[in-house]
């Protein structure tokens, strides 16, 4: 779980996302409150429930990017889902309970990797001994049993030294490694994923774990044996319990496109993929117990962050009960020309840096001048205003069109350099930007 302060979280988000300070502050406070809650005594800790967030803003302003970056910072079970993928219970499609099942699977994987990392040093020692046993088989007594030696032989120590120095990396050895059972692929209708997973687990357990002799280079065998030995040191039951605790206390669910499940106008018949989904989400957000293949998971303290553009619908179109369970509202602002300029230059892996690095692989140097960047930003903003406003995603389209000729000819122009200035941008984009019909289809 992350112990970063709100200011540190915002500072980290600033490296990748331009503007949207209110949204950054809201998620930073929510993340820090997870840590604060764990410092309370158990009685009060149970009473403190997370304050779920609803992020409202046009497409392409950074809602999903905030979620992506938050997942890396949280160091906690995190899942991002699309609200449009779900249908009401009893109808064809995914049920909302699968959100918690997927979150628990992610937590098990995360805890497993952490446990393997904690046991890595011991696993490396055991893997080293297994390789040395192949290189210098231990002495056996008259009954064919391996004798335990108090002190390793001089030859074994010499080989250990060579192994650690990498002198034996390319030598081939034959070792016995565990083989994973071949998975049985079961086709099931949507909504039956849990049953499918249980059947697959059952067939894998029936097959059991077998060992197979393989011929590998020592460096490859060492990696394989480390993973195998580390897995043996992990207790599966403890791992599952840790994962469930982690989900219940620190889990974060990000629900994107929640505006797409708002009811629009008067419709006849059941609305299974809109209002029905909202009703099914209610118990999850409020707190209930969900059955997963790893055990029962309580959702009372899972943090839910929902986001939507709300261009056609409005937050008040959500059912009142769900509105009440998303108490913190954050509005993200539409991007301006200045924001576009900052997006092109400020993030640690900005679009301009990406294109420079790609062209350098061909031995070609491209550089973006300040007036060139201003012109690119202005062109993207103009196209957004005259056609559909897709926010920062427009920059991808504009830049790809701008660099198209350079990308095509880069392999033939090794050693050359190109400055992308305002004149270059005008030459390649002005005609498209000015013609609304062309920009609608090309940009």
UniProtKB/Swiss-Prot annotation:
PANTHER family: ATP-DEPENDENT CLP PROTEASE ATP-BINDING SUBUNIT CLPX-LIKE, MITOCHONDRIAL-RELATED, ATP-DEPENDENT PROTEASE ATPASE SUBUNIT HSLU. Keywords: ATP-binding, Chaperone, Cytoplasm, Nucleotide-binding. InterPro entries: AAA+_ATPase (IPR003593), ATP-dep_Clp_protease_ClpX (IPR050052), ATPase_AAA_core (IPR003959), Clp_ATPase_C (IPR019489), HslU (IPR004491), P-loop_NTPase (IPR027417). The gene is hslU. The keyword Transcription does not apply. This is ATP-dependent protease ATPase subunit HslU. A double ring-shaped homohexamer of HslV is capped on each side by a ring-shaped HslU homohexamer. The assembly of the HslU/HslV complex is dependent on binding of ATP. GO terms for molecular function: ATP binding; ATP hydrolysis activity; peptidase activity; proteasome-activating activity. The keyword ATP-binding applies. It comes from Photorhabdus laumondii subsp. laumondii (strain DSM 15139 / CIP 105565 / TT01) (Photorhabdus luminescens subsp. laumondii). CDD domains: RecA-like_HslU. ATP binds at residues 18, 60-65, 256, 321, 393. ATPase subunit of a proteasome-like degradation complex; this subunit has chaperone activity. The binding of ATP and its subsequent hydrolysis by HslU are essential for unfolding of protein substrates subsequently hydrolyzed by HslV. HslU recognizes the N-terminal part of its protein substrates and unfolds these before they are guided to HslV for hydrolysis. GO terms for cellular component: HslUV protease complex.
């Amino acid at each position: 779980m992350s112990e970063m302060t709100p200011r540190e979280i915002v500072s980290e988000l600033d490296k990748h996302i331009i503007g949207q300070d209110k949204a950054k502050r809201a998620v930073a406070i929510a993340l820090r409150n997870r840590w604060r809650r764990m410092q309370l005594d158990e009685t009060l800790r149970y009473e403190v429930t997370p304050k779920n967030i609803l992020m409202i803003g046009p497409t392409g302003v950074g809602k999903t990017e905030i979620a992506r970056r938050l997942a890396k910072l949280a160091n906690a079970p995190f899942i991002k889902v699309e609200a449009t993928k779900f249908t009401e219970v009893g109808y064809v499609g995914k049920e909302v309970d699968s959100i918690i099942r997927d979150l628990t699977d992610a937590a098990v994987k995360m805890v497993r990797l952490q446990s393997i990392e904690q046991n890595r040093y011991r696993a490396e020692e055991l893997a080293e001994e297994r390789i040395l046993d192949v290189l210098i088989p231990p002495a056996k007594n008259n009954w064919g049993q391996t004798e335990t030696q108090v002190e390793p032989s001089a030859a074994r120590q010499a080989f250990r030294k060579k192994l650690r120095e990498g002198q034996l990396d390319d030598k081939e050895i034959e070792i016995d490694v565990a083989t994973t059972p071949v998975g049985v692929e079961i086709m099931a209708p949507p909504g039956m994923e849990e049953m499918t997973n249980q059947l697959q687990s059952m067939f894998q357990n029936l097959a059991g774990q077998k060992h197979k002799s393989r011929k590998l280079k020592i460096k490859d065998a060492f990696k394989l044996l480390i993973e195998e030995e580390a897995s043996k040191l992990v207790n599966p039951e403890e791992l599952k319990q840790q994962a469930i605790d982690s989900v219940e206390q620190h889990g974060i669910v990000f629900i994107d496109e929640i505006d797409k499940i708002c009811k629009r106008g008067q419709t006849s018949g059941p609305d299974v993929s809109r209002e029905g989904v909202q009703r099914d989400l209610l118990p999850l957000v409020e707190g209930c117990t969900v059955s997963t293949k790893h055990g029962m998971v309580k959702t009372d303290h899972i943090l839910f962050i929902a986001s939507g553009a709300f261009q056609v619908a409005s937050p008040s179109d959500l059912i009142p009960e769900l509105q009440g369970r998303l108490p913190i509202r954050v509005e993200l602002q539409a991007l301006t020309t200045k924001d576009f300029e900052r997006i092109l230059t400020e993030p640690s892996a900005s679009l301009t840096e990406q294109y420079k690095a790609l062209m350098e692989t061909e031995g070609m140097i491209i550089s973006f001048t300040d007036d060139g960047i201003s012109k690119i930003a202005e062109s993207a903003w103009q196209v957004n205003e005259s056609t559909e406003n897709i926010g920062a995603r427009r920059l991808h389209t504009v830049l790809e069109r701008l660099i198209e000729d350079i990308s095509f000819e880069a392999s033939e122009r090794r050693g050359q350099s190109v400055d992308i200035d305002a004149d270059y941008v005008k030459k390649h984009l002005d005609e498209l930007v000015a013609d609304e019909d062309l920009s609608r289809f090309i940009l």
